[in-house]
């Protein structure tokens, strides 16, 4: 039988050598044996499902040193193939083990929030392209089939409000509705989907043609998720990146109440008691008071910079920059 050392297994599986030896000692790796004080492991052994992956270890060994860092890059497919990407895909595993209905991640600027949300979009979204190729060499893929089964399973609604920094509510509203219209257009198959009713198709046409009325936009997440659910026979994942940017801008420029009112209606329709919602993700810098914007959203789980859960997936750990 061809054997490999603990160090070789560490490189292959993306975990520390110490973790490999601990797993061997605990009998977690079938066929592992100690010879002359060193662990020998079958070369065809699979990484145990409970092995903790040292995020970034895979890329440090596998990625050429000359690749640039993905500074300012928020496109996961681009960052993970053309740049020196630190593997954060175990965030998906941690989420799937708990499956909260709606998760809010609050982190400072430049902590990789948008890149992580795009990673979630690429992983979960059902598309014509086989997007599994962006994960087969990542830590999440080594965790087993029960996690792989979620890849490419859901229709996804993705909105990022990170650039909505306008001086008036009128300009902000126009920017927000344009982003919503662009996301509707991304799902162009819905325009003539036989699974959707005429009322939904009429709303779809008003939003993509603009201008629709404010009621259409406030209920746009609920409408789009319902249409996607019917079209794909599968509930939708909703991802809202930098949800609080328009609200912060409203506070600075004097239209806070208008921004909060619109966002409250938008989120309530899409994330509260929505039968067409599989699960939702939001990111932001601040947690705006629940009473002002997340009123009645009892299924919201907040993960802040002070929480240990998910803390290794935003920014970099000491090991990752060592």
Language-model region placement:
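Intrinsically disordered, charged low-complexity linkers and terminal tails
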Residues: 2-3, 23-26, 61
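Ca2+-coordinating acidic residues in Ca2+-binding motifs
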Residues: 8, 45, 242
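Major-groove DNA-recognition helix of helix-turn-helix-type DNA-binding domains
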Residues: 14-40
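Polyanion-binding surface elements
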Residues: 1-19
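Short, structured motif recognition centered on aromatic/hydrophobic residues
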Residues: 4, 38-44
